[in-house]
Design a protein with these regions (language model features):
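N-terminal nucleic-acid-engaging modules of covalent nucleotidyltransferase systems
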Residues: 3-172
Length: 172
């Protein structure tokens, strides 16, 4: 006689479910590291030494211009997404490595202004969003989906850490 199973695992809306799979071990980042890798490493380093995490964010923001716009979108209460909430229907980029994807947030962060204002019609804005998600690496697309919905997956990269890393920028 077989034993009865006890429970079905974690319930669907469980609060302790990770928002996104993060890198958990420290790595040396290359000069062309993508935003997901930079923020994962900043999250790991911030657990041990906040000053090193701040320095890393400022250095890698100079190399990848998308770090600061993502932090502003995530932490600035004056910046609100004009895109519909919930998952976006798009075809995930199947590039085997992040540097083999069609594009990266490093080049596409200039489009962010259209996703937080009413400058373009809603249908065009949603089309631009889907095209952005389909062109960038999968992990960056997952990150952008969460940021769009107001969810921040990096618990140690906080608003105060961002304010210390970029003192000349105001995060309201």
């Amino acid at each position: 006689m077989s034993e009865k199973k006890r429970g079905r695992g974690r319930p669907k809306g469980s609060p302790n479910k990770p928002k996104m799979e993060l890198i958990t071990e420290r790595q040396t980042l290359t000069n062309n590291a993508d935003v997901y890798e930079i923020l994962c490493q900043a999250d790991i380093v911030a657990q041990e030494d906040e000053a090193k995490a701040i320095h890393g964010l400022t250095v890698f923001n100079d190399r990848n211009g998308a770090v600061l716009p993502i932090l502003r979108w995530a932490f600035d209460s004056n910046i609100n997404s004009t895109l519909p909430e919930g998952p976006t229907p798009y075809n995930k980029n199947e590039a085997p490595a992040t540097d083999l994807a069609e594009t990266s947030l490093r080049f596409e962060h200039k489009l962010f202004k259209y996703f937080v204002t009413e400058e373009v019609p809603q249908t065009r804005r949603e089309t631009m969003w889907i095209e952005l998600l389909e062109g960038i690496p999968q992990k960056e697309a997952e990150l952008m989906e969460l940021v769009k919905d107001g969810v921040w997956p990096f618990p140690n990269v906080t608003k105060s850490l961002a304010e210390k890393a970029f003192p000349n920028i105001t995060f309201n």
